[in-house]
Design a protein with these regions (language model features):
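Feature marking well-ordered beta-strand scaffolds used for ligand recognition
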Residues: 1-179
């Protein structure tokens, strides 16, 4: 798009599913957030260092262990939290998932998934690395779910929950109650 009146296709890549949101990680990397072929939320890291031959370098599907999943970050970019760092970036994605579990229909689970993008200075080595998840009250993930990151601190605000914890131990995030 260097000449907006004459856009050109310099390269292309066919991938299963689609991306609703593309986020620039670096000049050579793009992060896609969208839907997989199974219609589950997915994060996909694209290496565009060679624009004529972009590649999908890393893929994570959220809620893949159950029958359905969705993320409000697919339609509301403010639901995605992204903290850029020199070597490693951090991001969080809220999502809900559910289905048949042990023959019982249909429990649902609401979560915040935490990821790091590592190796971003060397695009060929960059990866999306799962860090952990914060469990929320079922039915609490919606378009207003937010995460605030401050160094190692982690704060989650949803329709029902207000939690705090640490990036290094997200599973231990606990409810914050006023005194």
């Amino acid at each position: 798009l260097s000449t907006p009146s004459r856009p050109e296709i310099l390269g292309e890549l066919e991938v299963p599913g689609f991306s609703d949101l593309l986020h620039e990680v670096s000049d050579a990397l793009l992060l896609g957030l969208g839907s997989s072929e199974r219609r589950h939320p997915k994060l996909e890291l694209y290496n565009i260092s060679d624009v004529a031959s972009p590649i999908s370098q890393s893929l994570v599907e959220l809620g893949s262990e159950l029958d359905w999943a969705y993320s409000p970050a697919q339609y509301n970019r403010y639901a995605l939290t992204y903290l850029s760092g020199d070597d490693t970036d951090r991001l969080t994605v809220p999502y809900a998932t559910g289905g048949v579990v042990d023959g019982i229909c249909c429990p649902s689970f609401d979560r915040i998934a935490l990821f790091e993008i590592t190796g971003k200075r060397t695009p060929a080595e960059a990866q999306i690395v799962p860090v952990g998840e914060v469990s929320l009250t079922p039915g609490s993930v919606d378009g207003d779910t937010r995460v605030v990151l401050d160094s190692d601190a982690l704060y989650v605000i949803s329709r029902v929950d207000f939690l705090s914890g640490f990036w290094s131990n997200p599973e231990a995030a606990a409810s914050v109650t006023p005194d």
